[in-house]
C-alpha cells in the first residue's frame, strides 16, 4: 500500500508506478533507513508519542528486519514497494501491527531520505578514504622500489629532461593526497543531520535534534528545515571529488599505457591485470588501465547529471531529486573499483630499467644542461638557449648525441666550451643538478619518500 493513498480515489497507472517507483535504485539505502528509523523511534518516545515499551518493540522489530534482509536481500525488490521507506514501513507493520503505523509520526520522506543519503555518503566516503590511502601506499612503495630508475620526462609527449620513476610515482602521490583532502573536507560538510526537518517546515514535535544527530553519529543537526530537505550539495561534492580523482587515475593510466607500449617498453604489467586478443596470439593488452581511463567519462557524466538536475529547483523538495541516487551510486561504484584496480596494477608493475634509461639518453634530453653549462661560463641564458638549439640541429644531422661532438666541434658553436662540458652532459649530472625541494635528484626523491612514509 502506498504511504499517500488517502487523498486519491482513482487507481495509479501501471506505467506511472513503473515511472515513479524508486525501489530498484534506493534499495541500497535499506540499512541507513532502518538505522534512521531506530533513532526516530527514540526521538518520538522522548516527546511522548509512543511509550518506552512501544519504542522497545519497534526497535526490536527493526533490528530483526535488518538481520532478515541481510540474510536474503532479494526480499526488498520482490516486495514491489514504491521505495525503500515504504518497504521498511510495510515490513514493520507486518511484524508489529498498528504500532508500526506510529513510527512515521512527525517525519516526512523528505527528511528521511535526506538523512539516509547522508548516512550512506558517510559510510561509503569512509571506505573511499581507505581505498585512496591504499593506492597512496602502493605508489610510495613503488617509488621506493624504483626511486633511482631513470626514464625520460615528457612535455607535449616529447622527451624533455631525465627524471626517475620514483619521482613520477611521487607526482601521483601528490594528486592522491589532494583527493584525500577534498574527500575528507566534503565529508565534514556532509556531517549534519536533516532528521526532524519534516517535509519542509520542521517537525511539529519538540524533540532534541542535537540528541537525534548524536544518535546517528552526525556532528550536528542541520539548522534550516527548508535547506535540509532540499540540500544535495553532498551528492554534488562527492561526484565532483570523484571526478577530479578520476582525472588523476586516468592520467596515470594513460602514462602507464604509454610506458607499457612496444614503442616505449619502460614497464611490464602483471598477467593479473592484462588480457589477450581473440585473434592475435601475441597480444597482452593493458585492459585494466584502459577501463580506468574509459570509466572516467562515465563519472563525469553523472556529475553533469546531478548539477543539471539541481540547477533550477525551487525550495524545498521536488521529485526531480529522486534522480540524485542512481548517478551517485554509479560514481561511487566506479571510483571504488578504479581505485582498487589502480592499486593492483601498481603492485605487480615491473620497470624495465635498461629500456627506460636508453630512452632517457636519447632525444637530446641533456640540452638544458648544455645551456646551463654555457650560462656558468658567463653567457646570458637566452643566447645560450639559441646556441644549444643550433647545436641540437647539427647533432640531429650527424645522428649523434650532444656529447658525441668533439671539443673542436663544440667550439664551432661557442668558444667558451671546454673539456669540462662532458661531465655536465651525463644522465647522472642531469639528475644531480635538480637537487632542490621537489626536484628529481636522487637525494630529493629519497627525502620525499621518507617524508611520505612518515605521514
From Swiss-Prot:
Subcellular location: Cytoplasm
Keywords, ordered alphabetically: Amino-acid biosynthesis, Arginine biosynthesis, Cytoplasm, Lyase
Originating species: Shewanella sp. (strain ANA-3)
A GO BP annotation: L-arginine biosynthetic process
Family the entry assigns: Belongs to the lyase 1 family. Argininosuccinate lyase subfamily.
Gene Ontology terms: cellular component: cytosol
Top-level lineage group: Bacteria
Recorded catalytic activity of this chain's protein: 2-(N(omega)-L-arginino)succinate = fumarate + L-arginine
UniProt GO molecular function: argininosuccinate lyase activity
Taxonomy of the source species: Bacteria, Pseudomonadati, Pseudomonadota, Gammaproteobacteria, Alteromonadales
Major subcellular site: cytoplasm
Pathway: Amino-acid biosynthesis; L-arginine biosynthesis; L-arginine from L-ornithine and carbamoyl phosphate: step 3/3
Name the record gives this protein: Argininosuccinate lyase
EC number: 4.3.2.1
Gene3D superfamilies reported in the protein's UniProt record: Fumarase/aspartase (C-terminal domain), Fumarase/aspartase (Central domain), Fumarase/aspartase (N-terminal domain)
NCBIfam families found in the cross-reference section: argH, PRK12308.1
